[in-house]
Regions:
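Conserved beta strand-loop-helix elements of the APE1-like EEP
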Residues: 107-109, 124-140
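Active-site catalytic loop in hydrolytic enzyme cores
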Residues: 135-165
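A short, structured active-site edge motif that brings together acidic residues
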Residues: 111-124, 144-146
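Active-site metal-binding loops of divalent metal-dependent hydrolases
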Residues: 39-41, 89, 171-173, 202-203
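Active-site neighborhood of phospho(di)ester-bond hydrolases with catalytic His/Asp-centered motifs
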Residues: 85-87, 115-118, 198-202
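Metal-dependent phosphoesterases centered on the DNase I-like endonuclease/exonuclease/phosphatase
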Residues: 177-208
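N-terminal, active-site-proximal structural segment of metallo-dependent hydrolase catalytic domains
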Residues: 1-108, 121-122
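Solvent-exposed loop/turn segments connecting transmembrane beta-strands
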Residues: 123-125, 147-151, 176-180
Length: 208
């Protein structure tokens, strides 16, 4: 039996992927405000009601005709933002038609910089990923596997140098409260030395 994703993930420092066709889109808008969005795209599925998790659950495993249209709508929405965190994107497998959805949305939204974090590698069956899309060139991108069962990750994106730099952590946390607290403690340690911090993503919990 073939085993996927058995390689141990470690913290990694990466450069962003560059979308050469949209380098003219770099920089902040005229009002100098950074527009942020976090979006769990559910592999491009359309989930409107709780029952759809059952009736449309097969769409998380297999390709379907509506996915391309859903991604186009998402891409149109993303074009209004400067920095986007994506959760539940597929990095290119049978269910997504072998399309890297992070890269695809970077093209649709005209983002010059993007990065895909692969958290669960199931080969051709699924490439469970987080992603970041940015109009500003990151100074550094850190890829962090989170504590707890394998398959959860955080991306730390840094703009600038030293303690005055802006750090943005994009994450998809666990369902269980105990593991989620461990993951948040890990993130807290990551950002402690920075003055300007933004946390965004799918926390799988409600704000208190």
């Amino acid at each position: 039996m073939r085993r996927w994703g058995t390689t141990e993930r470690v913290v990694g420092l990466h450069d962003p992927q560059v979308n050469e066709h949209h380098l003219e889109s770099t920089g902040l808008p005229a009002d100098n405000r950074l527009r942020l969005l976090s979006f769990n795209i559910q592999v491009g599925n359309s989930t409107e009601k709780y029952r759809h998790y059952i009736t449309r659950g097969w769409q998380h495993l297999l390709p379907h005709n509506g996915r391309a249209g859903n991604l186009q709508k998402i891409g149109d929405l993303l074009s209004d933002f400067d920095l986007v965190a994506l959760q539940e994107a597929d990095g290119g497998s049978i269910r997504s038609g072998y399309i890297n959805q992070v890269e695809h949305l970077a093209h649709l939204g005209a983002f010059p910089y993007w990065y895909q974090q692969l958290n669960r590698n199931l080969g051709r069956l699924a490439q469970h990923s987080n992603g970041v899309l940015s109009r500003l060139k990151p100074t550094a991108i850190e890829d962090h596997p989170l504590p707890g069962p394998k398959g959860r990750g955080a991306i730390l994106v840094r703009f600038g140098e030293g303690p005055e730099a802006l750090v943005v952590v994009m994450m998809h946390l666990a369902l269980g409260g105990r593991t989620r607290n461990l993951q948040l403690a890990y993130v807290r340690d990551l950002i402690g030395k920075y003055k300007n911090q933004v946390l965004m993503g799918d926390m799988n919990t409600h704000a208190n």
